[in-house]
Amino acid sequence: LFVAKTRSGELFSLLGRSKDSLGKIKRETSFFCPACGEPVILKTGAKKVPHFSHYRHCPVKPEGETETHLLGKKWLFEWLEKQGYRPQLEYFLPDLQQRADVFFERAGKKYALEFQCSPLSLSLLADRDESYRRSGIIPIWIVLDSRIRKEKGPFFSATDFLSFFIREGPASPFILAFRPDPPMFVKYVHLVPVSKSRFYYQKTTFPLSCGMKEVFRSCPPFDVSEFLAVWQREVGRWLIFCHLQRSAKREPALHALYASAIHPTLLPKEVGIPVPRMHAIETHPVLWQALIWLEFFRQRPRGGTFSMEEVKTYLRRSEKTGLVRWRKPVLAEGRDPFSPVKKYLLFLAKCGFARIRGNRYVIEGIPEPLPADRWREEREKFLKEQKALILTLFH
């Protein structure tokens, strides 16, 4: 904590005070947590920044606080202050029994900025987020950059904890992270799942001299050539080895393919196409697209029709049986979870496999399985041919 109450009830902030001046204050003044009312101790050691600490834990935020979190809060508070936002540090909201790291108001709206360092459970994070929103407060979640587990290449591991921080931006979904030392924002953009647990990303950084609008709205252009090369390699590798993964036995969608006498490598080249907002669906992109192909194209004649509502009903039913799984944080954000499905059907329509007539899709062609001896070459050729179309889907 940087802010505590004195015995008289006044708020006392440590920011801007020297360690020398705090020595006398520490000896003469008692301090209490503004949230829970318990006594706190003023620590002014040589290694850490001056801060207040509970003798036990605080029931409002029982996860405690690290030096990294203290520094991050300090930098973020000062960043907002320099922009004229008049922020309040460690603002306690008694109705919610929550303490925002930084609270501020702008243009009649209330905001709570949370710098999340501890890997809390998804349910706890979701509860805090929902409490803010119910009270008319817009939460801004920023994650500690080192919590993003990077892998070799442009990938990170997509845990439930990390998926909570995915937000929809003007140009692409993104995760906003922060490094306290040296202080900077790290923004992960153009997020596309290449498997159930791995995300492709592009990255950009912002020093604290950048303002709020630039940090949240700026986004580098999507390098589609680099991405498609990565996508082709990763999907090809998954198609070959997916049945050897430990999770294969627990993947109902994979079992559905085998039940239809289809090996993943033989799936049509039109299955396994990157589309925007696929992060909403936890199931592997190849698998949920394969299910749509099986249900709405392979088993129906040319000239047959189906509606988006029928697709939604099928996917909802598939969710109950475990065939398709959605990322819960994305659902909680209020976005349309079927957006990637609509984009995929639009892609198939533009490739000539369907015609949109009113609110129905008319089947005009059926994607065919690939030959066993040429599947890789056919996929690679198709992706190159459809590069421009895929790019339009992301804009």
Describe these PLM feature segments:
Residues 1-85:
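N-terminal cysteine/histidine-rich coordination modules
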Residues 76, 102-121, 132:
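Conserved catalytic cores of phosphodiester-cleaving nucleases, focusing on short active-site segments
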Residues 79-96, 105:
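A short acidic/basic microdomain associated with nuclease active sites
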Residues 117-171:
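Catalytic cores of nucleic-acid endonucleases
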Residues 162-219:
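A conserved mid-domain beta-alpha-beta active-site/ligand-binding segment of alpha/beta enzyme cores
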Residues 200-258:
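Eukaryotic partner-binding/assembly regions in large regulatory complexes
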Residues 246-395:
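Extended, amphipathic alpha-helical scaffolds
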